[in-house]
Curated annotation (Swiss-Prot):
Domain text: The BAR-like domain displays limited similarity to other BAR domains.
Native organism: Homo sapiens
GO cellular component: centriole; ciliary basal body; ciliary base; ciliary transition zone; cytoplasm; mitochondrial crista; mitochondrial inner membrane; mitochondrion
Gene expressing this chain: CIBAR1
Gene3D superfamilies linked: Arfaptin homology (AH) domain/BAR domain
Name the record gives this protein: CBY1-interacting BAR domain-containing protein 1
Stretches for region Disordered: 265-289
UniProt key word Membrane: yes
Compositionally biased intervals (Acidic residues): 271-289
Length: 289
């Protein structure tokens, strides 16, 4: 009878060990994966910040409507990264940290299991010793009685630790299920809040892009290509109002001026080319150093 009770307790302890090991394994994996998820989200936020900077830099070089549309888009996209930062902080606090605490919780449960196993082993040892004593000295009542007393003490201690372990594991299972519900509910809530805000921001950003007036900007671009040269037009009017002799003299002056200007431009261009060559050589030397 005593042997069967001991075997039943051992089977129960093994089942509890399996439950604790299962939580230790899977909660550890969940913690690592959720932590990686949060890190990836934080990196996405960092890349988005770089994208915002580049969009603003590009917008500064563009035509008015495109510039305004891109800058407004960048503002909305930057706002989204503020929400993403809040998402990262909430996930860390509400999901990753609670999972981390299970490392300590599992360690405490393993200590409880260890204490129970120690008591069970002591009980099994006393039972074996009693059986040997009965076989070797069946008539020695004093030794047998002493062994029975030791066995009774060990059995009581094992029973007490078993009840404590069973109660502890029951509380552990209840808390585990409650925590799982809380953690995953928090995860879903945080993600829904972020994506809800993201939908609003992306809608505004989309509208900013759609509001870009292509025709107006194209007209601005064309005007920049064919800007009116008022000084040239004024020279033509003045030339038409002069006498033939004045026109001839003016033509010579213009021709001379053109030659000087052309020579000067060529010299300036040559100087710039020389400077560029020097810069290229300097950069090449720096690269090879």
């Amino acid at each position: 009878m005593m042997r069967r009770t001991l075997e039943n307790r051992n089977a129960q302890t093994k089942q509890l060990q399996t439950a604790v090991s299962n939580v230790e394994k899977h909660f550890g994996e969940l913690c690592q994966i959720f932590a990686a998820y949060v890190r990836k989200t934080a990196r996405l936020r960092d890349k988005a910040d770089l994208l915002v900077n580049e969009i603003n830099a590009y917008a500064a070089t563009e035509t008015p409507h495109l510039k305004l549309g891109l800058m407004n888009f960048a503002d909305e996209f930057a706002k989204l990264q503020d929400y993403r930062q809040a998402e990262v902080e909430r996930l860390e606090a509400k999901v990753v940290e609670p999972l981390k605490t299970y490392g300590t919780i599992v360690k405490m449960k393993r200590d409880d299991l260890k204490a129970t196993l120690t008591a069970r082993n002591r009980e099994a040892k006393q039972l074996t010793q009693l059986e040997r004593t009965r076989q070797r000295n069946p008539s020695d009542r004093h030794v047998i009685s002493q062994a029975e007393t030791e066995l009774q003490r060990a059995a009581m201690d094992a029973s007490r630790t078993s009840r404590h372990l069973e109660e502890t594991i029951n509380n552990f299972e209840r808390q585990k299920m409650k925590d799982i519900k809380t953690i995953f509910s928090e995860f879903i809530t945080i993600e829904m809040l972020f994506h809800g805000k993201a939908l609003e921001v992306y809608t505004a950003a989309y509208q900013n892009i759609q509001n870009i007036d292509e025709d107006e900007d194209l007209e601005v671009f064309r005007n920049s290509l064919y800007a009116p040269d008022y000084s040239s037009r004024l020279d033509i009017v003045r030339a038409n109002s002069k006498s033939p002799l004045q026109r001839s003299l003016s033509a010579k002056c213009v021709s001379g001026t053109g030659q000087v200007s052309t020579c000067r431009l060529r010299k300036d261009q040559q100087a710039e080319d020389d400077e560029d060559d020097e810069l290229d050589v300097t950069e090449e030397e720096n690269f090879l150093k």
